Amino acid sequence: MAAREILDSIGVGQKYCNEIIGKVHKIGNNLGLPGPAIADTLEGLEEDVYDETEVAVKYPLDVKGVDILLVTPSADFFAEPHVDGLIGYGKVFHEAGVSWTMSTKASEAGNFGMFIGSYENMRRVSLRIREAALELGVKRIVFGECGHAWRVAYSFLNTLAGPFDFLDPDYPVPQHICEFTLNEIEQGTLEFDKSENDDMSITFHDSCNVARASRMGDKAGGQFEIPRKVIKAVVNNYHDMEWDTIHERTFCCGGGGGLLTDDLMEVRVKGAKPRMTAFKNVMEEKGVTHLAAICAICKSQFTKVFPYYGMDMFQIVSVHQLVSNALVMNRKTPPEEAPGYGEDDDDE
């Protein structure tokens, strides 16, 4: 990281990463999605979830005085399988009965400042989260599925943007969405029908920024145990890949470190080979069909490189996509809370 920072400071940093950081500073997220576009996306998700479940799950934006600020990668607003994970977050919060919101100011969990080794850019991106939490008056911050975002949050957030002494001290700062979900599972507030995922047999990819550069939960190894416990709570068919290809021995997806650009596709395909080999082996030996991950870059990378290895792009799934599939929606909502209730569709 020090070498990258030196190169960036003399103007020879990674073009792709600097373009991404520029979008965050100018607009608020890596994809350059303005607030109205995010609001429109979330409104669409509410309608989709209601059509599927007849439950009015809310995906709130910029709501003050709620318990939780969810900070998630902007990929979750944009494409599969990311958006399926976002749908799952909302369903979990709904069933847990907690109040929450997302923020247009902090509409990006990712922090590409880390990839160019720039402390100043890491700090500026992180401060958006602090400012949003203060403005909205939340009690806790929960991060969505993003590997390097979790690394920055877990390892550096307090020194980059702290102190966070204005948050509720009863909760960790930050908290991962998998931690939140597992806690609700263990408390018995969530009910699942595992058979909803019986069309898949799952394995899990340990994203390197989570596996080797952070922790999760209150004990060592939680970053390995917690996501797997969540997965096993919602599926009937799960198998790990070979022991020397997972946990702290995991392989990079091939797209991390600022490589996630089509200009470097040849490098990305070659970089993915060790993980693809391990995945193919567990497919052949155990009948696994899908790979789950909790990293936006990993999911984006595998979506692109799977076809190069004879696999379907839809074989990569979000962990909270699996949660969403299996979650039984017991907290029913009255008709007047349905999206579009009271609107007159007739032309006048």
Positions of predicted regions on the chain:
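Short, flexible loop/turn elements at secondary-structure junctions
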Residues: S74, C178-T181, C208, C295, ...
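Iron-sulfur-cluster electron-transfer modules
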Residues: M1-T159, G340-E348
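Active-site glycine-rich loop that binds ribose-phosphate moieties when present
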Residues: R123-I129, F180-T189
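Residues at the C-termini of beta-strands that transition into short coil/loop
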Residues: T104-A106, I177-C178, D206, E242, ...
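Iron-sulfur (Fe-S) cluster-binding modules
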Residues: M1-V24, V57-V66, I87, K91, ...
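Local cysteine-cluster metal-coordination motifs and their immediate loop/turn environment
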Residues: M1, T72-F77, K105-I116, E120, ...
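Catalytic core of nucleotide-activated saccharide and alditol-phosphate transferases
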Residues: V142, C146, D170-I185
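Short amphipathic alpha-helical segments
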Residues: V83, Y154-L157, M216-G217, T303-P307
